[in-house]
Amino acid sequence: MTNNVITRFAPSPTGFLHIGSARTALFNYLFAKHNNGKFLLRIEDTDKERSTEAAVEAIFSGLKWLGLNWDDEVVFQSKRNDLYKEAALKLLAEGKAYYCFTPQEEIEKQRQEALENKQHFIFNSKWRDKTSDTYPKDIKPVIRLKTPSSGSITIHDTLQGDVVIENCHIDDMVLLRSDGTATYMLAVVVDDHDMGITHIIRGDDHLTNAARQIAIYNAFGYHVPIMTHIPLIHGADGAKLSKRHGALGVEAYKDMGYLPESLCNYLLRLGWSHGDDEIIQMDQAIEWFNLDSLGKSPARLDFTKMNSLNSHYLRMLDEDSLITKILEILNRNYKVSEQEVNYIRRGLQGLLVRSETLLDLAKLAKIYLVNIPVAYESEAKEIIANCDKNLINNVVQGLEKLERFDKESVQDEFKKIAAANSLKLNEVMKPVRALITGMVGSPSVFEIAEILGKENILKRLEIK
């Protein structure tokens, strides 16, 4: 492959950066970088009613967070209508397009009749071969492509193979609306040509659009980019991905505590593989990525795998980076003291073992916040309410007399208390853990005790 490869990511700014769109952007980015090419960004904002500035910013921030930095200036379709209009008029002048004056109501009537008769609807305009002397003066026309009435179009797809569509199944699509604005089909083709796009990688829901776009490419005499239509992401149940499956925006995954490196790795493995490799960091992905290793079957979103992968990436971070990320979350609602930061740092490895996301990590780190009351989970509250108060008094008395308060000494004392009360160690630790951490599952209580110290531990063992 030459270094002239140019790919593009072309979202419509009508909402958040969807997880499926993020994967499309990732594949385009990796293919471009693998071939020393360019990855371009185009905002398809011709739908003025649905496009929002907030959605544009969400796309920008989502891509930047994932590390998918684009080359060159962002292209906004809303600023290029003069270019589209000029292109449509060119086809009109060459006899490859025509003015159509048929009212939309009439077209809808024909569509409904075809539906009632269970027929495939293709609009055939009576204006296709009319001359200007027959044009009505009181109706603003649209400009339609004069699609060849015979022959076929072949989509040469690197993944789907050759897909042949007969021209008789392609209508004379509108290129320019009656208000002078371009349609999606025209804008995409003009932009891809103008931007020098060599490869189009997108979801296979665009496969039906491909034939119509190729018809426009052919009318202009443009070179058709190499196309790859990838299967969409499905939910764990095999159904089309929706919000109930977790079809959220990239920003939501960030807020849920996923790392961008982890999410990119996970999305890469959704529909692409490199042997049995699971952990693939960005530099390795750029080196390995190719279109030949794309899968033909829809990939399924699996949060268990996503969480497992994220926990791996958490453990790859250095201590200072982890502390910084934990504090970013905790400091939203609480000012963490230097002493508490030191506690968290000392207990970090114990927290990591039980964490899959940054939110898990931050939640567990609250164990080491000594200047606020312990936040008790409902199960912990129930355990405390039903615990043997005399047993807790024995624990307090045993810990008070300890001269050394390291984890070994604390553990030995708990073993003695358990034996003295004819209990198993975990029977003693269950209410103690609930009181000290507010949780039913936590890192080692013995380690927590050593880190927090006798005074803080005894304070937490006071049953209110």
From Swiss-Prot:
Please give the positions of the paired cysteines in each disulfide bond: none
For this UniProt entry, what is the primary localization, expressed as one broad class? Answer: cytoplasm
- List the Gene Ontology MF annotations in alphabetical order: ATP binding; glutamate-tRNA ligase activity; tRNA binding; zinc ion binding
- Domain of life where this protein originates: Bacteria
Which EC main class describes this enzyme?
Answer: ligase
GO terms (BP aspect): glutamyl-tRNA aminoacylation
Q: Which NCBIfam families match?
A: gltX_bact (TIGR00464)
- The name this protein carries in UniProt is Glutamate--tRNA ligase 2
**Record organism:** Rickettsia bellii (strain OSU 85-389)
GN (gene name): gltX2
